[in-house]
């Protein structure tokens, strides 16, 4: 895929957070350089997904693959480094926003259009999604029938790493003060990924604080 300005910005966004965590944990500066070099190679090989709404998730995946080829640590250890780096980043918290911004009803028309466009399957590695309006049990749902993270990991010969990107979804939901319920993912062998997002109850808010 082309190393566009958006791709570079997303890479730097993740790299800045992870570099701080690597330094905190005593890694040499050479590790960050190795990640950078490896990530460039992955991007050169990666299939295009156009102006996908989930480009950030695609680059999160490419970055995580690069980490696993550079740090000498296990996938679990790299996941923890990545997770903790993002959680410690004030910029990351600011960029992803909060529950009210995420669940703003004004965003629904755009989401429905995204869903319709995704089913055209213009790009092999892009996500294909159905958007589910809220019900009595959740506020917003997604059913993903194709996962770009799984596709990229498969292309790179490391399908086992996709499950760690799935785990990051819970981290993002927690940062936004939302509850995510999911019964299966494509990475785990399910036919689709069923995301159900909800606002936290008063009791859950108290527990979180």
What do these predicted regions represent?
Residues 163-209:
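C-terminal structured interaction module
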Residues 51-55, 59, 153, 157, ...:
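Conserved aromatic-histidine-acidic binding/catalytic patches
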Residues 1-69:
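N-terminal, charged low-complexity regulatory/assembly segments
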Residues 7, 157-158, 208:
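A generic structural signal for short
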Residues 130, 155-170:
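Conserved helix-adjacent loop modules within structured domains
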Residues 59-65, 69-156:
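Amphipathic interaction/junction segments at domain boundaries or subunit interfaces
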Residues 30-34, 75-88, 182-187:
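Short alpha-helical "patches" and their helix-cap loops
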């Amino acid at each position: 895929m082309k190393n566009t300005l958006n791709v570079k910005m997303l890479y730097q966004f993740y790299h800045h957070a992870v570099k701080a965590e690597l330094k905190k944990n005593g890694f040499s500066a050479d590790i960050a350089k190795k990640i950078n070099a490896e990530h460039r190679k992955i991007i050169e090989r990666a299939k295009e997904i156009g102006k996908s709404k989930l480009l950030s998730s695609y680059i999160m995946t490419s970055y995580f693959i690069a980490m696993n080829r550079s740090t000498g640590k296990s996938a679990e250890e790299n996941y923890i480094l990545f997770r903790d780096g993002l959680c410690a980043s004030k910029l990351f918290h600011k960029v992803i926003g909060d529950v009210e911004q995420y669940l703003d009803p004004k965003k629904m028309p755009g989401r429905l259009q995204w869903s319709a466009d995704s089913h055209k399957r213009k790009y092999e590695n892009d996500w294909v999604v159905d958007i589910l309006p809220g019900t009595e049990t959740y506020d917003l749902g997604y059913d993903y029938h194709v996962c770009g993270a799984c596709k990229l990991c498969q292309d790179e010969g490391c399908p086992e790493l996709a499950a760690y990107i799935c785990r990051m979804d819970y981290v993002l939901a927690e940062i936004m003060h939302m509850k995510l319920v999911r019964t299966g993912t494509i990475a785990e062998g399910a036919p689709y990924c069923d995301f159900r997002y909800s606002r936290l109850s008063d009791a859950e808010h108290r527990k979180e604080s």
